[in-house]
Amino acid sequence: MNSNDNQRVIVIGAGLGGLSAAISLATAGFSVQLIEKNDKVGGKLNIMTKDGFTFDLGPSILTMPHIFEALFTGAGKNMADYVQIQKVEPHWRNFFEDGSVIDLCEDAETQRRELDKLGPGTYAQFQRFLDYSKNLCTETEAGYFAKGLDGFWDLLKFYGPLRSLLSFDVFRSMDQGVRRFISDPKLVEILNYFIKYVGSSPYDAPALMNLLPYIQYHYGLWYVKGGMYGMAQAMEKLAVELGVEIRLDAEVSEIQKQDGRACAVKLANGDVLPADIVVSNMEVIPAMEKLLRSPASELKKMQRFEPSCSGLVLHLGVDRLYPQLAHHNFFYSDHPREHFDAVFKSHRLSDDPTIYLVAPCKTDPAQAPAGCEIIKILPHIPHLDPDKLLTAEDYSALRERVLVKLERMGLTDLRQHIVTEEYWTPLDIQAKYYSNQGSIYGVVADRFKNLGFKAPQRSSELSNLYFVGGSVNPGGGMPMVTLSGQLVRDKIVADLQ
């Protein structure tokens, strides 16, 4: 009998972090209950069908597929038997106000031709930048990812002071790191916008975030066949096969405590579920406020883990095709510094935002009726700020600015061709997922506030309470929150020993 068999684990929240934790713990022999307040698993990886269109409501990009594969192989399964993924090419298409269009491509020769549009020597600079990005990634994978390092002191202990200083470019911002190698302003902007993965500003995030381009080029950029939600369905199926009990439409209202430990979770319907270990996929600060009723002194310690940005999310079904689009597209601001400062410093809506646009029908036409396509639009905007409240009219005005900008940059008569629409503001995101102040990516990466670290996975209040998801290390995005579930299993097993 496995020594973990009698350990009852309750996982709160069935986002990818919660699903990953449940699977990893069940594989290690724990008895696991997974409690989800919504009517389906997946968290922000969500799906909606409307008027013949199938919308992926959450993440649109899959990278680092080996992290997902590890969940399945750890359980003696093959991921390909549960879900199919395919590479997306080009990675991104980048549109600028002057009419320039630059693709990011996996194939080196194609990438050279694209970057040659920006002038001689640009590709050589890009290659030197990728070498720098690779070094950052290699060092990060060795400790932060592989060992689950959970903060600055863990990092210093593992790498040592000198290696930490030399390996992670600690005195520069992401933007400064890019500009060490890249002189063309368009390529600077493209590389800076890899920060979209973690919902932060390249001017405030540490240079370590420059590992993101190498991750994308090395591991590829992928799509889940049939829609991104298929990954959540595959993980749900695996969890059930491993004996995880999943309760949907069940909201946790309290984590009950005794002698410095979590002893049970209480549901909104009054049910009390005893637990030996609790794992929360609810973000750390909302969980401390809502489930733990943490004292002000504990909450104050968490202030440096400020929420990431949010987004105005437009899911459009249009009755025509836009052949100039790739699967993933960026329409850049003419004033990138002003855009990021608006979002992250003054907490207002940008006058000229950079826009991320996903056209999944380029890879998967079956997601829309014949002759139609899906266009998902996501400009980054501030998280909810109680001191600078934005109104429905403010969000509506931004929607109009965004659509006008896209029409000006080539999406002719876009507004006239919208036949169905789903429109989310930070208020909707907060209400649906209980994310901290409506943030999308968990905790902001800011070298002055938190050195780019997220909150620790172990609770500082209760010895058997752990956290997973985008608000804790290693951070936001599909692969990182999935990795967090695997790392928390390792911490729990180590703590029990």
Swiss-Prot record:
GO biological processes: carotenoid biosynthetic process
Listed cofactors: FAD
Keyword set, alphabetical order: Carotenoid biosynthesis, FAD, Flavoprotein, Oxidoreductase
Matching SUPFAM superfamilies: FAD/NAD(P)-binding domain
Keyword Transport: no
Coiled coil start-end: none
MF-aspect GO terms: oxidoreductase activity
Disruption-associated phenotype: Cells lacking this gene accumulate the fully unsaturated C30 carotenoid backbone 4,4'-diapolycopene with some additional less unsaturated intermediates.
Pathway: Carotenoid biosynthesis
Reactions catalysed, as given in the entry: all-trans-4,4'-diapolycopene + 4 AH2 + 4 O2 = all-trans-4,4'-diapolycopene-4,4'-dial + 4 A + 6 H2O; all-trans-4,4'-diaponeurosporene + 2 AH2 + 2 O2 = 4,4'-diaponeurosporenal + 2 A + 3 H2O
EC number: 1.14.99.44, 1.14.99.-
Note from the entry: CrtNb is not a carotenoid desaturase, in spite of its apparent sequence homology.
Recorded family membership: Belongs to the carotenoid/retinoid oxidoreductase family.
PANTHER family: 4,4'-DIAPONEUROSPORENE OXYGENASE, PHYTOENE DESATURASE
Job description of the protein: Involved in the biosynthesis of C30 carotenoids. Catalyzes the oxidation of the terminal methyl side groups of 4,4'-diapolycopene to yield 4,4'-diapolycopen-4,4'-dial via the aldehyde intermediate 4,4'-diapolycopen-al. Also able to catalyze the oxidation of the terminal methyl side group of 4,4'-diaponeurosporene to form 4,4'-diaponeurosporen-4-al. It has moderate to low activity on the C40 substrates neurosporene and lycopene, and has no detectable activity on zeta-carotene or beta-carotene.
Protein name per UniProt: 4,4'-diapolycopene oxygenase
Organism: Methylomonas sp
